[in-house]
């Protein structure tokens, strides 16, 4: 539980929720009024793996060999739902791209995708 104080906020990272075996949308709904910044990245399951396999792997999700890092918007995170909730809540803080594990081209693709999300949910 987050202490009720203006000095405690949340750095929302949907991929960390996936890594922990949690639902990123449920987490966001629980902390939405406290989000002060967000990391944007995405995780993928290796071919043939399921979320249940991830939850059972090595006793916990963690940084399992069943997860890969890749282009934001193409993995397990539901970014339209995330941006819809953030926009509806009036969030206007930082969105930091946490990417580049597989080279600059993937970083560019992530940036393009996130720009589209911002344009869609935060029209000028």
PLM region spans:
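Histidine-acidic metal/acid-base catalytic patches
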Residues: 1-124
